[in-house]
């Protein structure tokens, strides 16, 4: 990373980068943050520093969390307020524009055909996709949802866990960790369920029925925070 930062004119991020934020760069380098979401349901970045599920305040300062950005891409004017808080920047660095992930969402890549060819046993059911955000209670919450679908005929629950959480194990259900991306699974799904994940905004682009499963809303609000 250090070599490419030293030899590049532009660096584009979709997450926090230690090398970008901690190092001093040449003045000609432009750093663009295009966060990996189309919105901000939950508090994140600097918004969540010091909370139970956020970063430690001393560590975030020592690691210069979200420093050195020249521009922050925001998908809407309403989201801009939360992005300024999360990235510690003012309005002069915010650029309102559509994000590349929207093009990915709208691109037809035959995901359904490929998925059902590989998983023919799922082709006759309505697919309900559960996309939880990362939190320590993931497995417990997923088990609750499993109970809700236990006696529902004609629907198959697919659980796609957050990339940071790999401990979800749901017996007799289809816990997915294969080669299809989250967007592929969203294209396949008939119904999408989430909680505090920004995938809710992606689901709205797909025009799919969307439900929020938030049995821990009060606890999560106090531990992490909701925008």
Describe the residue ranges of each PLM region.
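Active-site and donor-binding regions of nucleotide-sugar-utilizing enzymes
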Residues: 1-106
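Donor nucleotide-activated moiety binding/catalytic core segment of transferases
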Residues: 2-5, 10, 163-201, 205-206
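Structural alpha-helical scaffold elements that stabilize or flank donor/cofactor-binding regions
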Residues: 3-4, 24, 65, 121, ...
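Redox-cofactor binding/interface segments in oxidoreductases and associated redox assembly factors
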Residues: 12-13, 33, 74, 130, ...
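Short aromatic-enriched loop/helix-cap "lid" or pocket-rim segments at secondary-structure transitions
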Residues: 43-47, 107-109, 169-172, 222-225
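Conserved catalytic-core segment of nucleotide-activated headgroup transferases in glycan assembly
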Residues: 86, 94-171
